[in-house]
A protein has these predicted regions:
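Generic detector of short, locally flexible boundary/turn motifs and exposed helical patches
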Residues: 1-3, 36-45, 80-81, 119, ...
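N-terminal small/polar-rich segments of proteins
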Residues: 1-21, 28
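N-terminal start-of-chain detector that recognizes signal peptides
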Residues: 4-9, 44-50, 88
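Amphipathic, non-transmembrane alpha-helical scaffold segments
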Residues: 7, 11, 93-97, 101
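Auxiliary, metal-adjacent structural segments of Zn-dependent hydrolase domains
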Residues: 18-75
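Short alpha-helical functional segments enriched in proximate histidine and acidic residues
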Residues: 20, 24, 99, 103-107
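Active-site scaffold of zinc-dependent metalloenzymes
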Residues: 52-97, 107-126
Length: 126
């Protein structure tokens, strides 16, 4: 699958998803830059990554009052997501949403356990 198509599907999914989030979470989501990338390797610290990541949150979390001017960013690695989902469009779209919500949870200051407790690893928001 080509990156342009995967980007288009991801963009559609993310726009739909943000619209149905609770208002406070929706407002938080709008403060985060979303970067759709083919795969890890384009970031300055990517040499520390395994290469099979689906997404990554970088920058200050919403709880940090002073982020030193750094912009919070969620990076989604579309080729990894595509391969992870068995190259099925429906599953890919679902996983884009799930991965975004998971990384958004980190922006909100939640650790892995708190993200899981809210169901964000399964695409649900509690």
């Amino acid at each position: 699958m080509d990156f342009e198509t995967l980007s288009s599907w991801a963009d559609e999914e993310l726009k739909s998803l943000v619209k149905i989030l609770p208002a406070d979470v929706q407002a938080a989501a709008k403060k985060v830059v979303i970067s759709l990338e083919e795969q890890p390797g384009q970031g300055s610290d990517d040499d520390t990554l395994e290469g099979d990541e689906l997404g990554l949150f970088e920058g200050p979390c919403a709880l940090d009052e002073d982020g030193d001017g750094e912009v919070p960013r969620i990076r989604l690695f579309l080729m990894n997501l595509w391969e992870w989902t068995g190259e099925e469009e429906h599953d890919y779209r679902d996983e884009v949403g799930t991965t975004f919500l998971h990384e958004l949870g980190h922006y909100l200051g939640w650790d892995e356990d708190e993200v899981a407790d809210r169901g964000l690893e399964h695409g649900f928001f509690i």
